Amino acid sequence: MRRVRGVGNLLVTILVVLIGFKQARKYCESNEAEFCRLTSLSRASPWWNEHIDPYWDSYVSPCVTKIHDYEHKLDEWAAPRIDRAYYQVQDIVETKVVPVTYKWYKTVQFKTQVYYNGHFVPFLGHARILAKQWLASEGFFQRLYLHVQQGLFCLRNWSLWVWNGSLEAFNEIHSWSGHALQEISNKFSVTENQSGEPVTDEDPSDTDESKYYDAEYFEGEQGDYNEDDETVYLTSTIIETVTLSDEKQLDKSTSAANGDDGSSLDVPLRDLVQDEFQAWSNTVEQKASNTLTQFDSEVEELVEAKLSKAQPNITGLLQGISESFQSHYRIINRAILDVDCTMELDPETGEQLYFNKDGTQLRKYVTRPLMREFFSSAHAHVDERLEMVRARLEKFVAAVNKEVEQVRQEHLEVYEEWGDVMVSEWSKRMAYVDVVAAMGAEDMNQQQHDNWKRFLKLKKQVVNTRDLLMQHPAKLERLQKFLNDIQFTLMALQRDAGEYLFILRSQANIAFQTREKLEREREEEERRKLEQERQIQEQKEREQQELAENEARAARERLALEQGQGQEQLEQNSDEAFFSMEDITATPLGADDNTDYENALDDADSQLSESGDSEDNFYDSYEGDEEDASRELERLERESAERETLDRLELGQRQKLQEEQHRDELHHSSQAN
């Protein structure tokens, strides 16, 4: 109906504009006022008078009159169709368009929030920190940034001041133009009333209606510029409309009332009883139909009051849950970034220290078990918080159902009390009528019998209404919609949390694989270096061993050579001594010769003793070289045993890492499935 009234008001506005323009044209035919120069198109342009006025009088004016005559018929014809089409469109929108749109809106909202908080916010925070560090290092740009910030602040304040001043000026111009237009319209209406000319050539009723529409037009114009007086004009319009439309009906009702006063002096008992019984039956039926309506209305008010209190709490709780999720996401993101770290040794304590890309020391080295602990904590937190919300919703629904049952019980008690009173009182009234009818002259037996049958039927109707009220389902569509929205929100939170944690788990796995690959490459490089050093050491040891063997061989050759030379010299000395002994025995010796002989014997003995000593020294040096060589061999064997032990430990660690990685992959694949 509001839309029909809007269409009707539009047509009335067009009609008022056309009639006002026509009146102004007639007024300005013999008037030279300044107002006529603005409103009369025939004076402003002769072309209008020559080409438009004939068609205006022939076609437009009759159409305006017909539109005015058929306006109420248009309302009667268009109102039901417009209402039916409006409610059909409204049902389609509420049942199909709104749920789907709301579902997609919630999905997009939560997805955007999750990815914004999970990806963009950490990146933005990191970029902000880098920008602050860069500004702190660059003094010129820092001063420039401060000057630009102050300039933008001053520009914003100046823009607000200019905007407020412009709004005040616009409001003043708007108010002044409204008052000016009101004064012009008042002058125009006063001039029209003083002119005494008829508005149209129609009957007086049309003239009154035209005046009414003129008043409505100017009241609407004034209401556009001054909203404070809108209620007064609408009230006056309604009063005038009621007066014009209901005058004849009021006269008819007054005459009918006067006629009833004249004829109601002598009412038969039959008619009086029948009227009272009809009134009572109408009351019972109306009460029966209103009871369910009142119950539904009170339940709706109760649910609305409960939701107005619970909805902000649930909304705040969901926001807190989302923020707590984001805190866990930030912890996991920080841990994923800290996977890529470097290790350094503390020069004082020799402890291993780990630093991230920013150069910040890590409190704890991030490992796969620690990352699994973070993910387990996040999953447990999500499940716990969502279960808490569901428990609170169940408690809220139980409280609402309890209060709804209390309202139902109150309505049942009130209706039962009303039914008992009405039935008992009306049964007494009917019994009294039976007594009076038996004493009177009228025959009312059949009528009273019919009334008692109707009374019994109405009594059963009261009882049935009571039973219907007990079983009538409460209209909790508003509560159900709220619960559906919350359930959808919880499902979206749980789904988004699972998806995002799966993404973070994949990122963490990639980060660990990258770090393990770098560690393997680093270990391979260290192993390669150790192998090269070991080969170099073995080559040096081999060279030293060969050198020692060569020296030992040379020493043995030198010893053999010296032994051979000593034996030859000993043989020569023994031969010379033998020959000298023969010479001595063959020739007689004097005192000097005896002395020389003794000296030669002493020299031979000394040479033999020296050769024996040199041989002993040679064997001693050879035995010392053999001991050094054995010690060197023992050292080489010990180093090779240590290298084999280190290789076995390294192989065991590598196998352990491979087994742990295999278990992680199996765990991830099982969770994904």
From Swiss-Prot:
Subcellular location(s) of the protein: Mitochondrion
Annotated region (Disordered), positions in chain: 530-551, 587-673
GO biological process terms held by the UniProt record: sporulation resulting in formation of a cellular spore
Annotated Acidic residues bias: 593-605, 612-629
Superkingdom in the source lineage: Eukaryota
Stretches of the chain forming a coiled coil according to its record: 503-568, 617-647
Compositional bias per record (Basic and acidic residues), positions renumbered to this chain: 630-673
Keyword field: Coiled coil, Mitochondrion, Ribonucleoprotein, Signal, Sporulation
Main localization (coarse): mitochondrion
A GO-annotated cellular component: mitochondrion
Keyword Transport: no
Subunit structure: Component of the mitochondria-localized RNase mitochondrial RNA-processing (RNase MRP) composed of one single RNA encoded by the NME1 gene and at least 31 proteins. Absent in the nucleus-localized RNase MRP (NuMRP).
Family stated for the protein in its record: Belongs to the SHE10 family.
Biological role: Involved in spore wall assembly. May be a component of the mitochondrial RNase MRP (MtMRP), a ribonucleoprotein endoribonuclease involved in the cleaving RNA transcripts to generate primers for DNA replication in mitochondria.
Name of the protein: Outer spore wall assembly protein SHE10
Protein's organism: Lachancea thermotolerans (strain ATCC 56472 / CBS 6340 / NRRL Y-8284)
Gene this chain is encoded by: SHE10
